[in-house]
UniProtKB/Swiss-Prot annotation:
HAMAP family: AstB (MF_01172). Keywords: Arginine metabolism, Hydrolase. GO terms for molecular function: N-succinylarginine dihydrolase activity. Substrate binds at residues 19-28, 110, 137-138, 214, 252, 362. It comes from Aliivibrio fischeri (strain MJ11). The active site is at E174, H250, C368. This is N-succinylarginine dihydrolase. Homodimer.
Length: 444
């Protein structure tokens, strides 16, 4: 059966704001306390989804989290009505309210790790939500993320859903942002590539000194076991600790892969020559590494433009397209390198840029916004069809955003009880549009 690599992008939630919550993410911290535009953000995301749909790709939509997260604020000791909980939390700990109001679930590369049926011993697609324990504001996502994934991929004949790994630093897991897959054809056995920042149990591994390593070797190994992956087609590699300390908080900020191609920076991995050798050994002949030299693109330029936080996708005619943030065009060194790369015909054939300013200012580019899910024909039919991008869904979701989303949010607005009402109303309607059922705590 012919398989495709679909992309499921996260809808930006109604509380999209710039609270600078992500230590190690330079863009997030540098735009702290700025004024956000949730309506523009959700529409920018929808435009990208629609563009990929129009190019002929299978494009899905994943719902956002319920925010502000009143349930978590109550667990942390704030009581009274929902309005009082918001008021008290803003009065005593505005940082906590900001964390419980984050729309960071838009970056579905962190939603979880997905292994296609061609790679798993039981022949089913496996999903594990990421525990995201390194950042409090993201560590409260995995239960609802699991609900959203189950409502989107519900057929137990084809899909297996696991719980997130234990909420412990030993098993810190950041999902598909540290995972990619190489293959000849999407429906054939592939090589799954897990990248970690540190080992929790083995102190002989190097670790970054300035910023945290969010993914552990132990977490990556646990997911490979849970998904039933074949050892000879599974490769583990350590991210270069030095680039983590320079703002490369996930591997997808310094490398991206698709089919037979790894597009990475010269300084992406520790022992990079061995990593390339291991991948070539698992993949076999024809593996293509495009390694960007530091003298062409510095790590700083890579982080500032999100060159590698791009999408490498293969079109129906076999050509490879790279989806880039507009920031890449605006950097003369990066743009010159990319055009040189196209001219050299080394495996990337076309460039396509998108304006994702609202997401980029919070530290997330095109690759952050999507979760890749390889599906064969039967699995495609088993997906909740109301979550797949179409002309109708694009129009409906734009009208939905116009109805429910604000065009301006600053820190103090998070304490506004009306924002909670607006957010819940939006999500309640969204679950009906996308036939998701009662996936949110307020709907129980």
């Amino acid at each position: 059966m012919k398989a495709v690599e679909s992309n499921f992008d996260g809808l930006v939630g109604p509380t999209h704001n710039y609270s600078g919550l992500s230590v190690g993410n330079i863009a997030s911290k540098s735009n702290q306390s700025g004024v956000s535009n949730p309506k523009q953000a959700v529409k920018q995301g929808l435009e990208k989804m629609k563009a990929l749909h129009d190019m002929g790709f299978v494009q899905g939509v994943l719902a956002p989290q319920e925010r502000p997260d009143i349930h978590t604020l109550r667990r942390l000791g704030f009581s009274g009505s929902d309005s009082e909980v918001l008021k008290k939390s803003y009065q005593y700990s505005p940082q906590l309210l900001a964390a419980c109001s984050s729309a960071s679930s838009m970056w579905t590369a962190n939603a979880g790790t997905v292994s296609p049926s061609a790679d798993t011993t039981d022949g089913k697609v496996h999903f594990t939500p990421a525990n995201l324990i390194n950042k409090f504001h993201r560590s409260i996502e995995d239960q609802v993320t699991g609900n959203i994934l189950k409502a989107t991929f519900s057929d137990e004949k084809h899909f297996v859903h696991h719980e997130a790994l234990p909420h412990s630093d030993y098993f810190g897991d950041e999902g598909a942002a540290n995972h990619t897959r190489f293959c000849r054809e999407y429906g054939e056995q592939g090589v799954e590539f897990f990248v970690f920042g540190k080992s929790a149990f083995n102190e002989s591994y190097l670790a970054p000194k300035k910023y945290p390593a969010r993914q552990t070797l132990e977490a990556s190994e646990a997911i490979a076991r849970t998904h039933g992956l074949r050892e000879q087609f599974t490769v583990f590699a350590q991210q270069n600790p030095d680039v983590i300390d320079r703002g490369v908080f996930h591997n997808d900020v310094i490398a991206v892969g698709n089919k037979n191609t790894l597009f990475c920076h010269q300084q992406a991995f520790l022992n990079q020559e061995k990593v390339k050798s291991d991948l070539c050994a698992s993949y076999g002949s024809g593996f293509n590494v495009i390694e960007v030299p530091t003298d062409k693109v510095s790590v700083q330029d890579a982080v500032e433009t999100y060159l590698f936080n791009s999408q490498l996708i293969t079109k129906a005619d076999g050509t490879t397209l790279i989806i880039l943030p507009e920031h890449c065009r605006q950097n003369s060194r990066v743009w010159a390198y990319l055009n040189e790369l196209i001219e050299q015909k080394r495996g990337i054939d076309e460039l396509h840029t998108f304006d994702l300013k609202q997401s980029m200012q919070n530290g997330g580019g095109p690759a952050c916004l999507r979760l890749r899910v390889v599906l064969n024909e039967a699995e495609q039919k088993a997906v909740n069809q109301h979550t797949l991008m179409s002309e109708e869904l694009f129009t409906t979701l734009n009208l939905w955003a116009d109805k429910h989303y604000r065009d301006r949010i600053e820190d103090k607005d998070l304490a506004d009880s009306q924002l909670l009402v607006e957010s819940r109303s939006a999500l309640d309607e969204l679950t009906q549009i996308m036939h998701l059922g009662s996936i949110y705590p307020f709907q129980k």
